[in-house]
C-alpha cells in the first residue's frame, strides 16, 4: 500500500481508467463469494458493522418504536414520528432501498431487507449476484432488481429509492466518476430520499492499494467530493468497536443541496 500525498489529486494508477477498473474486476473475480471474502478475512466484524449501521439508518426511518423487522415495512403500523435531533429534517417511509457494491448481499440481507419492502442490488461481479440468490434464501423474493454493473456506469431508475446505501466500494471510483455517480444517484431518489455512505477513512491524504485497485480517502477528501456532487451531509457517525488494526470507518447521511 502506497501513501499518496495530499497534493496529488489523482494517483498515477487511476489515470488509465480502463486499466484501473479492469484490474479491480480481475481482483474480485478471485475472491471467494462468502462473507469472509467480502470482508477481507474479517467476517467476525459483520454483526458489529450491521448493528451500528442499523442504529444510524433507523434514526431516519418512519418505524414503530418496537417493530418486527421480519415484517415488510408496507404492512407495519407507522406511528407519527417525533425527534429533537435537528440534523434529521424528516422521516422516510422505508419503501425501496438500493445496495451499491452489494457483493453477495451481506448488507442487503442483514441491514436493508429487515427495514425496507424491496431492495435492489448493484454489483459489478455477476458471480457474486448469483451467489446472493442462495445466500439470501427466501428473502431473495423481495429483491427488485439484480444489476450486474460497476458503479462508474450504473444509472439508478429516476425517483425510485427511499435510501441509497453505499458501503466499502467508493474507493474503486476515480474522483470524477465518484462525483458523476452521486449526481446520478440524486436523480434516483424518491422525494425526501437519503444517500448513506459508509467508508474507511485515512487521517490525511489518500492511501493507494494497487492489489485491489482502490484508494482510501480522508474525511476531508470525501466531504470535498460530496460537496462537488451537490450533496449536503446532514449526519455523520464513526463506527465503534472495530479491531484497532483496521481503518477508521465513518457513516454519512446526505441529501441533495436545496
Label each PLM-derived region with a short phrase.
Residues 169:
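Hydrophobic adenine-recognition pocket in adenosine-nucleotide-binding enzymes
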Residues 165:
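A conserved beta-strand element that flanks and buttresses the S-adenosyl-L-methionine
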Residues 2-155, 159, 173-184, 193-258:
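Class I (Rossmann-like) S-adenosyl-L-methionine-dependent methyltransferase catalytic domain
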Amino acid at each position: 500500500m502506497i501513501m499518496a500525498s495530499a497534493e496529488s489529486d489523482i494517483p498515477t494508477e487511476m489515470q488509465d481508467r480502463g486499466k484501473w477498473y479492469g484490474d479491480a474486476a480481475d481482483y474480485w473475480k478471485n475472491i471467494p463469494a462468502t462473507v469472509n471474502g467480502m470482508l477481507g478475512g474479517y467476517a467476525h466484524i459483520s454483526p458489529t458493522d450491521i448493528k451500528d449501521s442499523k442504529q444510524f439508518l433507523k434514526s431516519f426511518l418512519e418505524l414503530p418504536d418496537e417493530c418486527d423487522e421480519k415484517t415488510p415495512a408496507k404492512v407495519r403500523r407507522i406511528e407519527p414520528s417525533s425527534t429533537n435531533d435537528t440534523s434529521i429534517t424528516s422521516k422516510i417511509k422505508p419503501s425501496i432501498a438500493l445496495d451499491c457494491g452489494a457483493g453477495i448481499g451481506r448488507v442487503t440481507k442483514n441491514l436493508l431487507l429487515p427495514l425496507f419492502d424491496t431492495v435492489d442490488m448493484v454489483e459489478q461481479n455477476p458471480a457474486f449476484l448469483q451467489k446472493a440468490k442462495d445466500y439470501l434464501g427466501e428473502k431473495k423474493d423481495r429483491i427488485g432488481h439484480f444489476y450486474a454493473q460497476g458503479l462508474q456506469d450504473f444509472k439508478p431508475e429516476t425517483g425510485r429509492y427511499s435510501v441509497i446505501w453505499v458501503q466499502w466500494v467508493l474507493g474503486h471510483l476515480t474522483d470524477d466518476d465518484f462525483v458523476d455517480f452521486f449526481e446520478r444517484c440524486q436523480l434516483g431518489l424518491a422525494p425526501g430520499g437519503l444517500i448513506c455512505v459508509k467508508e474507511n477513512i485515512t487521517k490525511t491524504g489518500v492511501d493507494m492499494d494497487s492489489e485491489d485497485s482502490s484508494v482510501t480517502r480522508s474525511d476531508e477528501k470525501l466531504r470535498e467530493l460530496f460537496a462537488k456532487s451537490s450533496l449536503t451531509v446532514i449526519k455523520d457517525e464513526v463506527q465503534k468497536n472495530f479491531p484497532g488494526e483496521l481503518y477508521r470507518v465513518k457513516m454519512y447521511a446526505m441529501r441533495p443541496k436545496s
